[in-house]
Amino acid sequence: MLPSMMVARPDPQTTSSSSHRGLLIVMTGASGVGKGTLRERWLAGQDVFYSTSWTTREARPGERDGVDYVFVTPEVFLEKVRQNGFLEHAQFVGNHYGTPTEPIEAALARGQDVVLEIEVEGAMQVKERMGEEAVLVFIMPPSLTELRRRLTGRATETPERIEKRLQRARDEIMAAHAFRYVIVNDDLDRAVRELQAVQRAEHARQRPETEWTAEDRAAVQLAETVRSTVLTTEDLQRIVNS
């Protein structure tokens, strides 16, 4: 990590341009890790298509239908599955989640970056379907103790369901090398800078290196520090045991 390095925000001319297909950035991680807050800060002011997932779970206090999720009945969701209308879909803690395909393909084709915030199982489906086009970013908790505190603080889950989420989080953390990037969300400002760097670096790599600006090179340098390959199995085990 290089918390002192400043990276310019992605240029709107590179994040929404018809000359290149847009980036497909998939943000995933354990429930309670802070994906929503991080995503809002990262994407503020950007012309990025944020895909709103469908779900069959009940809305939490403050969540808005069509903004945070599209809340549907199981019957409506399963009909969409039968129509092959999801890029990915998964069942998590008894509820269905899915990402509709058509709006994503349309945004990518017009050169607009697309961001998905989805469950890990769904992220792996996107990786299988889209290959290297999908830029997978795993958001890591600083520790399991901190993740437990965040989940408990929600006051929306039973103790049994929290334990299920924590066990799943352990498994997901140990599989972090399946993702291209891993960002530890222990400092919101730093995590936002790292996401901005990843986005700019991936755009830079679509062009010859001779065309890179100084800001592009700084972004590539910072993005390399959050590659999943930087983490050892021992690093992941320490977080799981913490």
UniProtKB/Swiss-Prot annotation:
This is Guanylate kinase. Coiled coil: none annotated. It comes from Deinococcus geothermalis (strain DSM 11300 / CIP 105573 / AG-3a). One of its GO terms (cellular component) is cytosol. PANTHER family: GUANYLATE KINASE, GUANYLATE KINASE-RELATED. Keywords: ATP-binding, Cytoplasm, Kinase, Nucleotide-binding, Transferase. Essential for recycling GMP and indirectly, cGMP. GO terms for molecular function: ATP binding; guanylate kinase activity. The lineage of its organism: Bacteria, Thermotogati, Deinococcota, Deinococci, Deinococcales. Its EC number is 2.7.4.8. Belongs to the guanylate kinase family. InterPro entries: GK/Ca_channel_bsu (IPR008145), Guanylate_kin-like_dom (IPR008144), Guanylate_kinase (IPR017665), Guanylate_kinase_CS (IPR020590), P-loop_NTPase (IPR027417). ATP binds at G29, A30, S31, G32, V33, G34, K35, G36. Its main location: cytoplasm. The gene is gmk. It catalyses: GMP + ATP = GDP + ADP. Residues 22-200 form the Guanylate kinase-like domain. SMART domains: GuKc (SM00072). It is found in: Cytoplasm.
